Design a protein with these regions (language model features):
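Bacterial N-terminal signal peptides that target proteins for export
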Residues: 1-9
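Hydrophobic helical h-region of N-terminal Sec-dependent signal peptides
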Residues: 11-14
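Cyclophilin-like peptidyl-prolyl cis-trans isomerases
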Residues: 20-277
Length: 277
């Protein structure tokens, strides 16, 4: 849904001009440019409006950018607002500045790419591309954990290569101990056009369909049965670089340790996970 924020810009230059003997009338209001510092899905972006701001009220509205707020400060020629990017696609995010009477001063649209996450592991680097269009709940949930650094220095604690072929993580530290900071569980997202094929990432959960929190798994082979088995498991992205790292995970030796079966005999560590796009 579009969001709106009303900005009352006071032009100090107009007051100065009048005091210096210049024209006492305010200069014509204009917005010559709207620039943005970053366009990462799910993250806060800052839009800077450049122009000539008088004491007229400006209506700034956005599409697919949530939580619009005015940045404190600014000058007589620049003002900034922030909001959180909420969609991906071509021209999907827009910002428009107009007068109270509806006169449009400037309208700009921006492209937003699918979010990507760089995951550094003890076996190498993996680059993930997520799909918020098909799986918004799972994508947003995963990115919240990524951006809070929850996954940094955690284990791939389960590698299964019989029946299903998965490498699961997002739960334990190398101690091992349960990583603190889990968020509320999310609803299951299945039948979204995504399948548990080799190289995809999906949410792990318990028998409760709506119990996924921080744990995820990589599909080390085609596991299409997981699309429907026990209600299905939600795929939300894929590996776009580093497939050899998943192959290396599939070849690790496992044991039973700490009450867990299929536990890697040597630690496989997620060193860091960072949203890059």
């Amino acid at each position: 849904m579009p969001s709106k924020f009303f900005l009352s810009f006071i032009s100090l230059s107009a007051l100065v001009l009048a005091g210096c003997g210049g024209s006492s009338s305010a200069p014509d209001l204009a917005v010559s440019d709207i620039a943005v510092n970053q366009l990462k899905y799910g993250q806060l972006s800052q839009f800077t409006l450049t122009g000539n701001f008088s004491d007229n009220e400006i209506n700034v509205s956005t599409k697919n950018c949530k939580g619009l707020a005015l940045v404190a400060g600014g000058t007589t020629t620049t003002k900034s607002v922030t909001c959180t990017i909420g969609a991906v696609g071509t021209g999907v995010v827009s910002l428009e500045a107009k007068l109270a009477d509806g006169t449009v001063l400037k309208s700009v649209s921006f492209d937003v790419r699918n979010p990507q996450v760089s995951m550094q592991t003890s076996l190498g680097a993996v680059l993930l591309e997520l799909n918020p269009t098909a799986a918004p709940l799972s994508t947003d949930n995963f990115l919240q954990y990524v951006n809070s650094k929850f996954y940094d220095n955690t284990l791939i604690h389960r590698v299964v290569t019989a029946g299903i072929f998965v490498a699961q993580g997002g739960w334990l530290t190398p101690t091992p101990a349960v990583q603190p900071g889990q968020k509320a569980a999310i609803a299951l997202e299945v039948n979204k056009g995504l399948s548990n094929l080799k190289g995809t990432i999906a949410m792990a959960r318990s028998a409760d369909l709506n119990s996924a929190t921080s744990q995820f798994y990589f599909n080390l082979a085609d596991n299409v049965a997981l699309d429907t088995s026990n209600g299905g498991y939600a795929v939300f992205g894929k590996v776009v670089s580093g497939a050899e790292v998943l192959d290396a995970m599939a070849n690790v030796k496992t044991t039973t340790a700490f009450g867990l079966a299929d536990f890697p005999a040597s630690n496989v560590v997620v060193l860091s996970a960072t949203q890059t796009k």
